[in-house]
Amino acid sequence: MARPVRGGLGAPRRSPCLLLLWLLLLRLEPVTAAAGPRAPCAAACTCAGDSLDCGGRGLAALPGDLPSWTRSLNLSYNKLSEIDPAGFEDLPNLQEVYLNNNELTAVPSLGAASSHVVSLFLQHNKIRSVEGSQLKAYLSLEVLDLSLNNITEVRNTCFPHGPPIKELNLAGNRIGTLELGAFDGLSRSLLTLRLSKNRITQLPVRAFKLPRLTQLDLNRNRIRLIEGLTFQGLNSLEVLKLQRNNISKLTDGAFWGLSKMHVLHLEYNSLVEVNSGSLYGLTALHQLHLSNNSIARIHRKGWSFCQKLHELVLSFNNLTRLDEESLAELSSLSVLRLSHNSISHIAEGAFKGLRSLRVLDLDHNEISGTIEDTSGAFSGLDSLSKLTLFGNKIKSVAKRAFSGLEGLEHLNLGGNAIRSVQFDAFVKMKNLKELHISSDSFLCDCQLKWLPPWLIGRMLQAFVTATCAHPESLKGQSIFSVPPESFVCDDFLKPQIITQPETTMAMVGKDIRFTCSAASSSSSPMTFAWKKDNEVLTNADMENFVHVHAQDGEVMEYTTILHLRQVTFGHEGRYQCVITNHFGSTYSHKARLTVNVLPSFTKTPHDITIRTTTMARLECAATGHPNPQIAWQKDGGTDFPAARERRMHVMPDDDVFFITDVKIDDAGVYSCTAQNSAGSISANATLTVLETPSLVVPLEDRVVSVGETVALQCKATGNPPPRITWFKGDRPLSLTERHHLTPDNQLLVVQNVVAEDAGRYTCEMSNTLGTERAHSQLSVLPAAGCRKDGTTVGIFTIAVVSSIVLTSLVWVCIIYQTRKKSEEYSVTNTDETVVPPDVPSYLSSQGTLSDRQETVVRTEGGPQANGHIESNGVCPRDASHFPEPDTHSVACRQPKLCAGSAYHKEPWKAMEKAEGTPGPHKMEHGGRVVCSDCNTEVDCYSRGQAFHPQPVSRDSAQPSAPNGPEPGGSDQEHSPHHQCSRTAAGSCPECQGSLYPSNHDRMLTAVKKKPMASLDGKGDSSWTLARLYHPDSTELQPASSLTSGSPERAEAQYLLVSNGHLPKACDASPESTPLTGQLPGKQRVPLLLAPKS
């Protein structure tokens, strides 16, 4: 082909392709001329391309004619014990050298070819050690295989820095020692390290500092323990093989640092458990192989650090049960292999959380009850597509055995001696594609009639091999060949439960028994078994009985009794009997046994005594089974004052009951009750709260008159109850026949007070916590009496009487002018008061009384009739309107006042001219004198006087007026027996002139300031008597009149007696003492003066 090109040098170029080919040949022609023809293959070898195969020739030395073009040289399976480096001088292209299965005792030198050799295979020689100097010349070495030699140790000088080795195989040697840092020289390049089949017994912590290593093979060594942090430094490791060692324990953090590892092989070891601590840090693990170990139990939280695990292999272990949620944290798991274990119990919810699981292998276990009786064992496996139960002990399939597996596609029940399948056991599996059943023990009765047509309808009969074993007429026939009418139930060969065990509760130490009975028409041997929490009791104490159930003797009844002697807490659980014969097993209901212990106190509350404001602490703790609940009561109830005030603290898990800031109300009996289902016990403790003495009601100063009775009350509280002692001054009180004390000394009564009783009284309250004192100053005034002869009194009381009388007269005039009607009413000297219909009576329920409570007077006498003085000089009262005062109350200390009979007419004349209102001289001739007994709180009137009060409600805007003014005599007329008597302070002969020389003028001025109601009734209807004289009225302000006088006048200006009469002047004196007592509930009312008929 080159010749035409060369021959066409002078010819024109016909195509670009030919030109490129010609240029290429011109470039190669000098090389061909220089190299000459290709060297022939060595005489004792074979050639294939650039590979020279001299293996298996029995060579003891290198061939001498190795061609220079050799890239791969195979010298394996010879008898080479040493290598001459000169034989490799002319091999510039050599990259692979196979020297395995020779008799070399050291790593050979390949002379000039060593620098470009990439792969060196030295396995199956007799090399005893590796020296760093032997490997320094291999500057391009990436693969070094030293497996199956006699290397016994690896020191830190074996592999120097320099050779970029990526794969190092030291498997099959006799290495027993790995020196720390032995592979540090390869840290920049090493990707795969094989140390399998050696004699390594221990791995040093941080033995491997190989950050680029991805695979580490340590299988078939003698490692027994993996310490924590052993593999730290292997940051890129993805596959770790530790199978076939003798590992029995993985300490916490054994695989710490392997955060990128995907596959972990731990098969064929001696592990008995896998806990979360040993798998700590394996966050990226996808496959975990733990088959052929001795794992007997799976811990619930053992997989908390492997949440990305896709495949878990636990085959060939010693698992006997799968507990609830024991695999719940493996939410990403897709394949779970549990074959060849001894699993007999799968708890309900054992696979809960495995929502991604697709393949579940349970072959060759001892599963029976899970499929025959339990429902819900496979709940949570929503994505499961393949379930294999081959080679178990399943004899029947319950209706709900596979509930929760609606998406299942492949179900393998082969290798089980299945005898019956309950109706619709597989109906809910809509996606089922394969159902493997292989059994020749089917009981072909009416309960199996549904199965053949269902399998045919779902086209699953090809995977089912099912043969009848009963009745005899159908024995050996396939269920698909039996006519539907032949599936009949003439008897019940399989046992039927007729007596179920019952749930019970027992005290510790008692004997308990469960009874279970079943009936069957079969004569085949019957076996009995009891299960506790779905696990068979191997050494159960049972009694078994059998007797004829039917009269014809065809049905037998079998009874089994389980005895539990001296039960303990370990006997608690759910018990179930299983009665089995050749045709199947029957499972009873599960009866629960609860073992209880009556509560007993470990801490009991004790009586405590504390002060107020401190903290009370009560302890109470009890034991029992179930754990007793602790409850507290106070005085037999649940009303805790401290709880309402949030001062009570009870911790649920604590034994202490606290009350902070203790108060006296917290005292009482506290009961601690411990209760569980076995019973209850209680213990009591008394909380005594100590309180320092204190007064309930403050002790006040008192003022009494000579001859009266005074009571001083010292009502004290405290705990213990305080002892009360009375002192006068600084000395203990000397008791006389006038002094009386209650039994507890809280009330001191002094009768017939004398001047010497005045002074400072001290009440001393003391108990064990301290002493408190309270003081009261008792003042005694001279005795004061009331005489009927009408003595002149102080001008202040006269001013009050005159103000009220004049105010009443003005109001009568206003009523008269505005209403323009006459209404007569008669007044007699009787106990009755006649009131016009428009004026509400203070004795009736109409209207309201003016709330005047300036002063009151008290009496020790009982109630009397309305407004009349008795023969003894006492004025009666209306008892229905005013309550009877305390007979021991202190008498009023107001001097008795005498009101004269004369009125000053001049101010009223001026008022008549201005407003057209009649003055008092037109309404009454001759004033009447009224006496108020200041000591007896009664009103005293002169005999024969016609003086009647008329209360007016504040709310009454238009009270009616009398029909007309009564004719009267001169305004200077006086009754002869009502003249004022002379007193020690002075006399009041005939009481000349007005007693109110200036008050009338002031009242008149006040009236003029506020326009009165118009006579035609069109004026302001709110102008009432209450507004006229009430001190708080905003329309009429008497500040310039009544209050501008002396203080005695200001206090006495509204003085009224409780029955509505003006007080009579008694024992006038130059200075008047204002009244200081006040009786609650007393009301002062305005008065109307009626003329004498």
UniProtKB/Swiss-Prot annotation:
InterPro entries: Cys-rich_flank_reg_C (IPR000483), Ig-like_dom (IPR007110), Ig-like_dom_sf (IPR036179), Ig-like_fold (IPR013783), Ig_I-set (IPR013098), Ig_sub (IPR003599), Ig_sub2 (IPR003598), Leu-rich_rpt (IPR001611)
Gene Ontology biological process terms, A to Z: hair cycle process; innervation; otolith morphogenesis; sensory perception of sound
Extracellular side: 35-794
Sequence ranges assigned to domain LRRCT in this UniProt record: 440-491
One Gene Ontology term, aspect cellular component: plasma membrane
Induction: By EGF.
Cystine pairs: 45-54, 444-468, 446-489, 516-577, 620-672, 714-763
Pfam families: I-set, Ig_3, LRR_4, LRR_8, LRRCT
Membrane spanning stretches: 795-815
Residues carrying sugar: 74, 150, 246, 292, 318, 684
Annotated region described as Disordered, given as residue ranges: 946-983, 1063-1093
Domain LRRNT: 35-68
Cited SMART domains: IG, IGc2, LRR_SD22, LRR_TYP, LRRCT, LRRNT
Broad class of where this protein is predominantly found: membrane
The keyword Hydrolase is annotated on this UniProt entry: no
Tissue: Widely expressed.
Topological type in the membrane: Single-pass type I membrane protein
LRR repeats: 69-90, 93-114, 116-137, 140-161, 164-185, 189-210, 212-233, 236-257, 260-281, 284-305, 308-329, 332-353, 356-378, 383-404, 407-428
Keyword flag Transmembrane helix: yes
Function: Acts as a feedback negative regulator of signaling by receptor tyrosine kinases, through a mechanism that involves enhancement of receptor ubiquitination and accelerated intracellular degradation.
Subunit details: Interacts (via extracellular LRR and Ig-like domains) with EGFR/ERBB1, ERBB2, ERBB3 and ERBB4 (via extracellular domain). The physiological relevance of the interaction is controversial; LRIG1 may have low affinity for EGFR, and interaction may occur only when high levels of both proteins are present.
Protein name: Leucine-rich repeats and immunoglobulin-like domains protein 1
The encoding gene: LRIG1
